[in-house]
């Protein structure tokens, strides 16, 4: 089966990795407009390393600073899943875009355009996750644990904090925003959604 994944989110990488780990033979292509996975200037919620079993499988892809604590930054998880997926055969096409010209038939632009013919057919297409809805959370990376907030030690002398109110402190290095119900569950929920889609697809093939 030829599978096309239309973004490089944590959810989509979890989908790809679940398909790959199923033992089924599939050709998976992932499209990204970025130059590399996890490349973002915005702060996104991290997670505990033991929050999902899939994270244990990418532990060896984590930077050394991550080994000292239990907290994993969002970008570390993102890159770790990508490295593991690529090592299992995922084809990621960076700086690329795609248009569907007919049902299941796509045209590729950018670097992916040189890898494919004029048009390519795929048996299954995994679409990007819908935009989050819910509460607006304010995030911050700071040089100290912030009072009256749940701050997570990032392992390098900085702390990550998410709050429903704006965070103001002299030691803040970076601000961020995230929309959803619970920042501490953001990574786990994305992984679960990807796994669920993959299991649904695999079940339909039996």
Regions found by a protein language model. Give the residues of each.
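Fold-independent oxyanion-binding glycine-rich loops
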Residues: 8, 32-34, 128-130
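N-terminal FAD cofactor-binding segment of flavoenzymes
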Residues: 11-67, 75-76
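Positively charged, amphipathic N-terminal segments that serve as targeting/anchoring signals
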Residues: 53-54, 73, 82, 86-94
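Gly/Ser/Thr-rich loops at beta-strand to alpha-helix junctions
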Residues: 9-12, 73, 131-132
């Amino acid at each position: 089966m030829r599978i096309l994944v239309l973004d490089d989110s944590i959810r989509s990488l979890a989908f790809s990795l679940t398909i790959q780990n199923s033992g089924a033979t599939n050709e998976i292509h992932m499209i990204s407009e970025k130059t590399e996975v996890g490349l973002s200037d915005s702060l996104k919620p991290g997670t505990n390393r033991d929050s999902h079993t899939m994270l244990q499988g990418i532990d060896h892809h984590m930077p050394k600073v991550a080994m000292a604590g239990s907290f994993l930054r969002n970008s570390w998880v993102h890159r770790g899943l990508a490295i593991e997926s690529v090592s299992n055969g995922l084809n990621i096409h960076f700086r690329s875009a795609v248009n569907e010209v007919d049902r299941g038939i796509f045209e590729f632009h950018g670097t992916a355009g040189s890898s494919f013919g004029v048009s390519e057919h795929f048996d299954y297409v995994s679409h990007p996750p819908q935009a989050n809805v819910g509460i607006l959370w304010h995030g911050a990376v700071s040089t100290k644990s912030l009072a009256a907030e749940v701050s997570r030690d990032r392992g390098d002398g900085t702390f990550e904090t998410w709050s429903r109110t704006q965070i103001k402190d002299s030691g803040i290095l970076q601000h961020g925003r995230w929309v959803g119900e619970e920042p501490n569950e953001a990574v786990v929920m994305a992984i679960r959604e990807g796994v669920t889609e993959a299991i649904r697809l695999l079940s339909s093939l039996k």
